[in-house]
Amino acid sequence: MASGRKTKNTWVLVVVGLIVVGLAAGLEAMRPLANPLTVAIRSLALMGYQLVFLSIVSSAYILELVRFFGRPFVKVHHIASVTGLALVTLHPILVAVDKGSAGVFLPKFDSLRVFLQLGGRPAWYLIALAVLAALLRQRIGSRWRWVHILNYLAFALATAHANLLGTNFQDLAPRVVSWAMLFAVLAVFVRKRLPKPKPAQKPGAS
């Protein structure tokens, strides 16, 4: 039976999408002119990073998003999650094309700094697992939530990777914003694991 709920405020998703693209384009415009492949590599990473952030933060406002968009939260959430995964997948693929090597998909453990500098590599696998777990949540039951937690670790690794290696994160402003985003993600992680307050009992209720 079809739901009588009417989809609304879809324009907000369009605006958010334009902002994501605009921020990536703005940061890229601040850098010296590069070849199209390099621009694509950096822009895809920036847009994917933002969408992964939005998918994580949105999970803390399920009821509010359902009311605002008039559609199941999962649909809105998955738009950001799957699109973000697609973008952060295209990023290393183009890097591999540029380098002429598939080695860019392999994490490196030479030292802690090297691991974090190339943190985008393990982050990609973690994000892919988290998204896959969410898509298969009906098959694997409540266990999908534990796998989905990998998103938080992936975002932390991606933030370290961006700050230590990302060309567009060499200036102070992008660095500060990225660490503020990581702080927001960690706040969501903590908030979702705090005990929820019980609803106030009505006077006279037994």
Q: What name fits each language-model region?
A:
Residues M1-S206:
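Membrane-embedded alpha-helical bundles that constitute the cytochrome b-like, heme-associated redox core
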